[in-house]
Regions:
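Reverse-transcriptase-like RNA-dependent polymerase core
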Residues: 13-34, 88, 122-136
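N-proximal short alpha-helices
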Residues: 21, 25, 50-53, 57, ...
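Short low-complexity stretches enriched in small and charged residues
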Residues: 6-8, 49-55, 137-141, 186
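Soluble or luminal CAZymes and related metallo-dependent hydrolases
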Residues: 76
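Conserved polymerase palm-domain catalytic core
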Residues: 66-67, 72, 81, 85-211
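Glycine/proline-rich, flexible active-site/cofactor-binding loop segments
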Residues: 31-66, 135
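A broad, low-specificity signal for short, low-complexity segments enriched in glycine/proline
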Residues: 14, 53-59, 142-146
């Protein structure tokens, strides 16, 4: 692999991989605030998560869509707004969606499957598994903590099946910011087709939409 976002050379990547060999996370506590769960990790676990985040950003970069704008280096809120303002007048039909209780609905098995398909190694997989499972004390097999270092990246990955499907149709504009996404279409037919795809894919991911 070549060096990527967050790294300047291959040696640094290799050194970070060595640091997490056999690593696991330790959860110190959970609290609930404004409808979301937050986690407190031990200091060593926070260090491991920072390293894992850099490695996951590097390893997942080829698999994450540029249409997912909340990810580092993808434009952010300001870039998304500027882009939409630039193109919106060319399209007659607009639809906006967001996912109900997105973090709470992320299915662990489906997310691990996406990591598998991206070729993520066993050490990173184990850290992600701890990150998902340890706060899941009812053992529901779903949900991510809010405010966690890995959650934005994993949340970006989870909806890549939607990004990939919507990105195939060059007659529409599709952009996403975490679990909020916008579609611009020139015809009602294209918009309806896109909406059907969105509902099908989000249902496959065990998600429900606000509309």
């Amino acid at each position: 692999m070549t060096a990527s976002l967050g790294y300047t050379d291959q040696w640094s990547i290799d050194q970070d991989r060595k640091k997490i060999v056999g690593a696991s996370l330790v959860l110190w506590g959970l609290w609930y605030d404004e409808g979301r769960w937050f986690a407190k990790w031990c200091p060593r676990s926070r260090v491991i998560q920072r390293i894992a985040l850099d490695l996951l950003r590097h390893d997942l970069k080829p698999h994450l869509s540029r249409r997912c704008k909340h990810l580092k280096g993808h434009g952010g809120v300001k870039g998304t707004v500027r882009y939409l303002r630039r193109v919106v007048d060319r399209y007659r039909y607009v639809a906006r969606f967001d996912v109900m209780a997105y973090y709470e609905s992320v299915d662990h098995a489906l997310l691990r499957g996406l990591l598998d398909r991206a070729g993520i190694d066993a050490d990173l997989q184990r850290i992600v598994a701890d990150y998902l499972a340890l706060p899941d004390r009812p053992n529901t097999g779903k949900g991510m903590v809010a405010g966690g270092s890995l959650s934005p990246l994993l949340g970006g990955l989870y909806l890549t099946p939607l990004d990939q499907s919507m990105g195939k149709d060059t007659r529409m504009v599709y952009v996403r910011y975490m679990d909020d996404f916008v579609i611009l279409a020139r015809t009602r037919w294209h918009l309806k087709k896109a909406i059907r795809q969105i509902y099908r894919i989000t249902a496959d991911l065990k998600l429900r939409l606000h509309r």
